[in-house]
């Protein structure tokens, strides 16, 4: 079979969908569902999320420099999907999806989602402008 050459694109699927919670320094918080996330480095431990600058959560992330990657479950699939197609500019995702914002143990602003079994607390070390998305 001959090799096929495809134009550049996103070919690494499936990607994990996670709910990212963040807040600005005034306490305004939001949840954004992202699938562009992964490990960057083992030592020091680092991961990334990629977010479009026009997204509501982008300015919150940039202001506080904090976010939490919240791993989801089957039970949270509706909330995971819903938080990815609604904007925090228009709705309170915490209230609408009956999710609980909890206090992070190592962050000052970004809350954890209590209903998620794993909450990975993160501090932004760099914002890399890549094109359509910026990597935190």
Outline where the language-model segments fall.
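Active-site-proximal mixed secondary-structure blocks
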Residues: 1-34, 38-136
């Amino acid at each position: 079979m001959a090799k096929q050459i495809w134009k550049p694109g996103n070919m690494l699927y499936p990607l994990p969908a996670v709910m990212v919670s963040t807040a600005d320094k005034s306490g305004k918080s939001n949840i954004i569902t992202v699938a562009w996330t992964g490990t960057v480095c083992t030592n020091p431990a680092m991961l990334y999320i990629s977010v479009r600058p026009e997204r509501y959560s982008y300015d919150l992330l940039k202001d506080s420099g904090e976010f939490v990657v919240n791993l989801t479950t089957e039970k949270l699939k509706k909330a995971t999907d819903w938080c990815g197609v609604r904007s925090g500019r228009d709705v309170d995702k915490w209230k609408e999806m009956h999710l609980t914002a909890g206090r992070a143990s190592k962050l000052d602003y970004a809350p954890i989602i209590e209903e998620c079994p794993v909450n990975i607390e993160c501090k932004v070390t760099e914002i890399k402008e890549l094109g359509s998305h910026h990597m935190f």
